[in-house]
Swiss-Prot record:
PANTHER family per UniProt: LARGE RIBOSOMAL SUBUNIT PROTEIN ML67 (PTHR28184:SF1), MITOCHONDRIAL HOMOLOGOUS RECOMBINATION PROTEIN 1 (PTHR28184)
Record function comment: Transcription factor involved in regulation of RNA polymerase II-dependent transcription. Also involved in regulation of mitochondrial DNA recombination, maintenance and repair, and generation of homoplasmic cells.
Intracellular or extracellular location(s): Nucleus; Mitochondrion
Gene behind this protein: MHR1
Span list, region Disordered: 214-233
Classification via InterPro entries: Ribosomal_mL67
Membership in a protein family: Belongs to the mitochondrion-specific ribosomal protein mL67 family.
Domain of life: Eukaryota
Record's keyword terms, sorted: Mitochondrion, Nucleus, Ribonucleoprotein, Ribosomal protein, Transcription, Transcription regulation
Gene Ontology process terms (BP): mitochondrial genome maintenance
GO CC annotation: mitochondrion; nucleus; ribonucleoprotein complex; ribosome
Record-given protein name: Large ribosomal subunit protein mL67
Length: 233
């Protein structure tokens, strides 16, 4: 039974990685039965954060999001055991989710390439003037990812957003978030080895909720149309 479970988990990870390859359009996400979400994975070794439109990740995403690696910001390994879900952002529609994902990736590229010196100047330093670290772990990267998520939601005014965190302290102070746009909650407790199962369950739940909301909106629109027609008859 245990061997069967492990084989099943391995299959899901492989399939998930294949699905994660390439940037997704709205139709791609619908065809894959994905919800309007963005998944943020934290590297346990380095503190770096990886963004994904689906509940999995691919080497192509790592290559795209870490374009200028150096000794302080090395290109991370794709090893599944090094990545843990930090948060899952649920958006009101696919347009919002795609805008948020692209915004997060672009902000990372600006910080690492276009404004590299400016970004480093803002980071906490050690006595030698390097980005502060403990071992190989640099907390500044996850802090920047959280700040970027807040900025993207604010800048694009992505109302109806909800974010589920591994721990609420990750989001920082409430003053950094617009309460009229986003709500916060915690992820259900889970065993790290069952992460793929949890994320797939969150995906399925979000797909169902999105379908229900869309159906309600269509029914409301039809009702309004019927009332308008009866008034003009």
């Amino acid at each position: 039974m245990r061997k069967h479970l492990l084989d099943h988990l391995k299959t899901r990870k492989i399939l998930g990685a294949r699905i994660a390859k390439g940037e997704k359009t709205e139709q791609d996400l619908i065809n894959l039965n994905m919800a309007p979400q963005v998944f943020m994975f934290k590297n346990l070794f380095s503190g770096q954060v990886l963004y994904s439109q689906v509940p999995a990740f691919h080497q192509d995403q790592i290559d795209e999001q870490f374009t200028r690696p150096n000794w302080e910001n090395r290109k991370p390994s794709r090893r599944n055991d090094l990545w843990r879900i930090m948060c899952v952002a649920n958006f009101e529609n696919y347009e919002y989710a795609i805008a948020a994902y692209k915004g997060l990736v672009q902000l990372r590229q600006v910080r690492d390439v276009v404004q590299k010196k400016e970004a480093k100047a803002l980071r906490k330093k050690n006595d030698e003037g390097n980005v502060w670290f403990s071992g190989q772990y640099r907390p500044t990267y996850s802090q920047e990812a959280v700040a970027d998520l807040s900025h993207v939601i604010d800048e694009f005014e992505l109302e109806g957003t909800s974010v589920m965190w591994e721990s609420l302290w990750r989001k920082g102070e409430d003053t950094h978030w617009r309460s009229d746009l986003v709500e916060h909650d915690t992820l259900p407790p889970f065993n790290p080895r069952d992460q793929t199962i949890l994320l797939d369950e969150l995906r399925a739940k979000a797909v169902e909720e999105f379908a229900n909301l869309r159906q309600q909106a269509q029914q409301s629109e039809q009702q309004s149309q019927s009332e308008l027609e009866s008034q003009t008859a």
